[in-house]
């Protein structure tokens, strides 16, 4: 009898230790800091009772989930170098706020949404020409969990509500991806960050090249085969969709402000006529127009998704939308991208890698990713749930 009691005690102790170890690992992965003793006890209790998701949800309540985990998770999306070592900005803050409030995560690509610091903190006002507001918020030490306020982006950046497109029209994104160039960078990095594909992965040489702009040579180095077998693969899909950004630019003085620190997002309304195009289309859409003069001349911001045909049907476009595959402006393009299966799958894979410290690598992992994607969709695209489910799945590693 005494031996049975001893064995029972050992088994109970081992099970408890396992639950506590898993609880600590879940908390570490989600919040990036150890749990308090009291929180650890509660989390371990949830795990012992078969409610590991409740344990993960408790870890998500730690302010460090917002101040550290989410900030470092999102920051690389806001710059071309894809580094997390950048100051807090409106792009990062908006994603953090949207996750905190458990809003439909698809809204990051099309909603008239912005998160700013609480007015009671005495911060510099939000500005369209600098990042001082967010830098002061970060320096204040106030937790992003409690200090972010949701406002209408159009009220603060001057865009018409119909021209807002979530983080695409944030100041940070404009500085990084609308600055100079041809606005193709905005499309490419939206594809990388929110569809988990770079252009080479979606290249398709079978599509018509009728919307490829004049600045793309049809015979690079004197060899038209390079265009037909390489360049056309990316541009046939990219150029028609980048047309959605035809009225946007990021203006700054390259002589006095070469890095564009004091620049701002601009948008041509119906009354704005660009001197280079004699239309609302920004002059950058006529850059190097002599390279191939018979090429496409952008007349407006009408975009078309050629990838609904060909190999990129695999991205899972939403065929239930009443105006699928085309539209005007960044907002409707954002809706097109955010409604795809690839968007949902990308968010799940990114969270899995962030929490598990590795990408999905075996059949069990991919089965879990598929299950989490279904859960993500069924629960209103709540990204918190994906963090919780990923942490529970990897708790035993």
Predicted regions and their residues:
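Bacterial N-terminal signal peptides
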Residues: 2-10
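N-terminal signal peptide c-region/cleavage motif recognized by signal peptidases
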Residues: 12-14
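N-terminal mature-domain "stem" immediately C-terminal to a signal peptide or N-terminal signal-anchor/transmembrane
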Residues: 18-55, 59
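Alpha-helix N-cap/N′ positions at the starts of helices
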Residues: 18-22, 328, 367-368
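Extended surface/linker regions that mediate inter-domain or inter-protein docking
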Residues: 54-241, 338, 342, 352-355, ...
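Electron-transfer interface patches adjacent to heme c in soluble/periplasmic c-type cytochromes
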Residues: 170-183, 217-218, 224-226, 236, ...
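Short cysteine/histidine-rich zinc-coordinating motifs and their immediately flanking basic loops
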Residues: 243-249
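Generic long, charged, amphipathic alpha-helical segments
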Residues: 361-366
């Amino acid at each position: 009898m005494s031996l049975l009691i001893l064995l029972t005690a050992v088994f109970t102790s081992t099970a408890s230790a396992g639950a506590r170890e898993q609880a600590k690992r879940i908390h570490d992965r989600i919040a990036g800091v150890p749990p308090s003793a009291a929180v650890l006890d509660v989390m371990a209790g949830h795990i012992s009772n078969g409610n590991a998701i409740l344990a993960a949800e408790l870890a998500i309540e730690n302010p460090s989930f917002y101040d550290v985990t989410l900030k470092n998770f999102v920051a690389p999306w806001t710059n071309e170098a894809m580094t997390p070592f950048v100051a807090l900005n409106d792009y990062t803050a908006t994603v953090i706020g949207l996750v905190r409030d458990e809003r439909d995560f698809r809204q990051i690509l099309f909603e008239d949404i912005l998160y700013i610091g609480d007015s009671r903190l005495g911060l510099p006002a939000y500005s369209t020409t600098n990042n001082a507001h967010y830098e002061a918020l970060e320096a204040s030490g106030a937790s992003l969990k409690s200090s972010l306020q949701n406002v209408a982006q159009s009220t603060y950046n001057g865009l018409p509500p119909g021209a807002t497109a979530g983080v695409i029209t944030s100041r940070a994104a404009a500085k990084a991806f609308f600055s100079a160039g041809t606005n193709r960078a905005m499309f490419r990095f939206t594809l990388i960050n929110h569809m988990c594909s770079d252009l080479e992965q979606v290249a398709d040489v079978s599509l018509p090249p009728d919307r490829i702009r004049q600045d793309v040579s049809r015979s690079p180095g004197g060899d038209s085969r390079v265009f037909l077998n390489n360049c056309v693969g990316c541009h046939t899909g990219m150029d028609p969709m980048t047309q959605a950004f035809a009225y946007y630019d990021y203006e700054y003085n390259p002589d006095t402000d070469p890095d564009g620190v004091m620049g701002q997002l601009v948008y041509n309304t119906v009354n704005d006529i660009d001197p280079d195009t004699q239309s609302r289309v920004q002059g950058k859409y006529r850059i190097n127009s002599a390279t191939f003069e018979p090429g496409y001349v952008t007349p407006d911001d009408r975009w078309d998704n050629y990838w609904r045909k060909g190999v990129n049907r695999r991205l899972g476009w939403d065929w239930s939308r009443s105006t699928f595959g085309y539209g005007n402006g960044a907002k409707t393009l954002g809706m097109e991208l955010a409604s795809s299966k690839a968007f949902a799958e990308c968010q799940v894979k990114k969270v899995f890698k962030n929490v598990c410290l590795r990408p999905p690598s075996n059949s069990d992992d991919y089965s879990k990713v598929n299950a989490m994607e279904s859960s993500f969709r069924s629960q209103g695209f709540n990204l918190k749930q994906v963090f919780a489910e990923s942490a529970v799945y990897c708790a035993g590693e």
